[in-house]
């Protein structure tokens, strides 16, 4: 469990509160003298509240919202501007270990994080956007010790990461029965894909 103030911010003006709860249960199975299999499950929940207040309440100020890489939209802020970030991540990892003249470890993991941004307006929060972050990673590590006492280690890893940036178009329904924000349109406005290969000896 982690709770911090002014987390991951670049602009020092907002007041930011952040917490994260992380659970990682794991189990290891031993098969004979040389083989081990491990399983790890990970889940975490995060929440970040950002609030920016103005020292001059008589004049509204412009601020900018980043939407995608290098793309901003301007907005007008009054007494305070608030954003709430709620995220959940689920993933798992499989490990295999061989112990012998050469120690070998093979791992494969996958995780998906979904983070939603909302604007807390009274009791009906308005959706600002969402981010879906998928990560797939495989790695191979081996080491051995020669007769001369020298240890040789090698590690090869590959990671595939895909990020979708989702935006919403919402309209407020002022009917007495609903009085809530209605999503008219939801779509992926930005996509990022990265591949990373790492080799160490």
Please identify what each model-predicted range represents.
Residues 1-72, 91-93:
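Internal, well-ordered domain-core segments that constitute the primary functional module
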Residues 1-3, 39-45, 106-112, 154-162:
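Transmembrane beta-barrel strands of outer-membrane/channel proteins
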Residues 9-16, 52-59, 66-89, 114-133, ...:
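Extracellular/periplasm-exposed beta-strand and loop segments of Gram-negative cell-envelope proteins
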